[in-house]
Swiss-Prot record:
This is 4-hydroxy-2-oxovalerate aldolase. GO terms for biological process: catabolic process; L-leucine biosynthetic process. PROSITE patterns: PYR_CT. Residues 2-252 form the Pyruvate carboxyltransferase domain. Its EC number is 4.1.3.39. It comes from Burkholderia thailandensis (strain ATCC 700388 / DSM 13276 / CCUG 48851 / CIP 106301 / E264). It is an enzyme of class 4 (lyase). The record marks R10 as: Transition state stabilizer.
Length: 347
């Protein structure tokens, strides 16, 4: 049976600048539970401890978000996203105290070593720990396998490849998922973004390659061009004969029901989202890049290229400002140089 992890109340928070209310969390968690969703992930878009001036502040804290969801769930498991450095061991302790069932410890795809203490902390408490390798397009299959093996050794019960930038094509997904499935003794999962319009296709390919866990959001509600759309994914999975706890009818009822209290809009793939996917930049960076380009008066797509050259990972918003400022200075120097040349030619 394929396990579906619903990130609507976590990754979806990116789409509305992390402003989900307690009432929305409770209503969606209850509806997802009734729809037979396996895991309902809740929190700031960047996970436990993510609320900040830099990343965006939530109107309610982690405790209230998790307590609200916990009270709404009966059969679905409650999950959280945790990035070491943004969150602390105390944040996991709080989540475990409240009754979180699944802690997804996420690191950059080449930094799995920093996940050890947090995976161990979760397992010691008797809860489920998943390892998550973010920005997975930035490492080849052999490197990803080596990193996933570290997480497995630390006690992770599954490893999820996260295509954080929506960069991957089906051939890349197949090669990487197959490598992990062949090399690990634990389940493999896949988390897609739709920047290139491939989220559902990539998720299906991941399942064909042996993945047992897929992430999705109702109506694709998520960062950038959105995540894998839950309803579309379940429909395609039914067509392909994949067994799940939910059904297309249940997730369609879930999607329709959310219009009354959440009303998530299925994201459209804008040129900025395509650029983010093409250049391999974290999907949540799009509004920050657009804002910086406007403030500094520089070309938005040139800024994408510059940031791609810097190989940005999640949590480096300050470098967006740095590169936009550098582009503006270079532009001003070029204009001054061109002005001198024109004056010399006119003399």
């Amino acid at each position: 049976m394929i396990l579906i992890s619903d990130a609507t109340l976590r990754d979806g928070n990116h789409a509305i600048r992390h402003q989900l209310s307690a009432a929305q969390i409770h209503a969606y968690a209850r509806a997802a539970d009734e729809a037979g969703i396996d895991i309902v992930e809740v929190g700031h878009g960047n996970g436990l401890g993510g609320s900040s001036c830099l990343l965006g502040q939530t109107p309610i804290g982690d405790r209230l978000m998790l307590e609200t969801a916990r009270a709404a769930l009966r059969t679905s498991r409650l999950g959280v996203h945790f990035i070491p450095g943004l969150g602390k061991a105390a944040d996991i302790a709080l989540a475990l105290e409240i009754g979180v069932d699944v802690v997804r410890v996420a690191t950059h795809c080449t930094e799995a070593n920093v996940s050890a203490r947090f995976i161990e902390q979760t397992r010691v408490a008797g809860r489920t720990a998943f390892g998550v390798l973010m920005m997975s397009h930035m490492a080849p299959s052999d490197v990803l396998l080596a990193q996933a093996k570290l997480m497995e050794r630390y006690g992770a019960q599954a490893v999820v490849l996260m295509d954080s930038a929506g960069y991957s094509t089906p051939s890349l997904v197949r090669a990487k998922v197959e490598r992990l499935v062949d090399g690990l003794d634990i389940d493999v999962g896949f988390h897609a973004h739709n920047n290139l319009g491939l989220a559902v296709a990539n998720s299906l390919v991941a399942l064909e390659a042996g993945a047992r866990i897929v992430d999705a959001c109702v109506k694709g509600f998520g960062a950038g061009a959105g995540n894998t759309q839950l309803e579309t994914l379940v429909a395609a999975m039914e067509r392909e004969g994949h067994d799940t706890r939910t059904t297309f009818e249940h997730v369609m009822a879930l999607a329709r029901g959310t219009e009354a209290f959440l009303n998530p809009k299925t994201p459209h793939i804008q040129p900025a989202n395509i650029a983010s996917g093409l250049y391999g930049l974290f999907s949540g960076y799009v509004p920050h890049i657009q804002k910086a380009a406007q403030e500094f008066g520089v070309n938005e797509f040139e800024l994408y290229k510059r940031l791609a050259e810097r190989k940005l990972v999640a949590g480096q918003e300050d470098i967006i400002i740095e590169e936009a400022s550098r582009l503006a200075r270079e532009r001003d120097v070029q204009r001054a140089t061109d002005g001198v040349r024109i004056s010399e030619l006119s003399a």
